[in-house]
Amino acid sequence: FQIETKSNSALKSKIVIGAYGKRSNIDVQLQRKFIEKKSPYLGVKIHVSGDFPDNKVALHNFKGGYCGVSKVENNHINLCYITNYGAFKTYKDIEAFQEEVLFKNKALKAIFKNSQPQFEKPLTISQISFQTKSPVENHIIMCGDTAGMIHPLCGNGMGMAIRSAQLGSELIIDYLQGKIESRAALESEYTKQWKKTFNFRLKVGHAIAYLFRKDWLAPKLLMLLRCFPFLIPLIVKMTHGKPMAVK
C-alpha cells in the first residue's frame, strides 16, 4: 500500500486497517456497495448536563424512531436518537421535531426539559446505513462501524469495534510473524472470524429494530417485555455477544 497525506508525503505499509467510522468519502473512493444506496435514517446527538444515574442506559421509543440516554465523560448525559426522513421532513427544524414528536414520550420530555445543553447546537448525522458491508475491501482490513454497524437499540457498537480490532490485530500479528502463509489466507480468515462473531448479532439487531420501527407494534412489544421480563436478558445475549478473552 502507498498512502499519500495532505502534506504530499507518502507512506508505505504491508497492512492498512480501515477504522474511519460508519460513512466516509473513503467509502466513495473504494466504491463500496452500501454507499451507492441512500439510507432513510438520520441521527441526532446532544450532550446535556442534568440528573441521570451513572449505571443506567435508557432506551425510549417515539413515533418514527427511538432515543438512547446514557452518562458519558465530564458528567454529561448523552442523548442520541435515530429517526427516518419521513418522520422528520414535515418539521422545519430539530427543535420543532423534538417538541412535536419526541416529547409525546413523557419520559423523554422530562429528560430534555430538565437538562441544559452542552453543545452549541445538536450534531446531526445523515445517511446512517445498517446495510451489510464487507469486512475486507480492496485488501483493507475493516474494523468497527467501517466493517458493519449494529442498531444502537440492540447492540454495543463500541464493544463491537474493540472486538473487531482484537480479531484483526491478532491475525495481522500472525501474518507478519509468518504463521499465516499468505495475504489471501489472512483476508479469508479475518472475514470468516468476523462473520462468525458478528453476523448473527447484526441479523437479530436488524430484526428487532425493524419491529420497533412499526408504530402500531412497538407499544405491544414493550408490554410483552414488561409481562415477560426474562426475555430481556435473552435478547441482550443474542445481540451483545460474549465477554472478550484477552490473550
Feature-to-residue mapping (PLM):
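C-terminal helical "tail/cap" subdomain of flavin- and related membrane-associated enzymes
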Residues: 170-247
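Short capping/connector residues at structural and topological boundaries
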Residues: 35, 53, 64, 77, ...
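Predominantly flavin-linked oxidoreductase catalytic cores and closely associated redox partners
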Residues: 1-111
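Short secondary-structure transition/capping segments
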Residues: 34-38, 86-96, 158-160, 222-238
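Short acidic-hydrophobic sequence patches enriched in Asp/Glu that either
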Residues: 36, 40, 90-94, 164, ...
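FAD/FMN-dependent oxidoreductases across multiple families
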Residues: 10, 89-171, 180
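FAD-dependent flavoprotein oxygenase/oxidase catalytic domain
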Residues: 83, 106-118, 125, 206-222
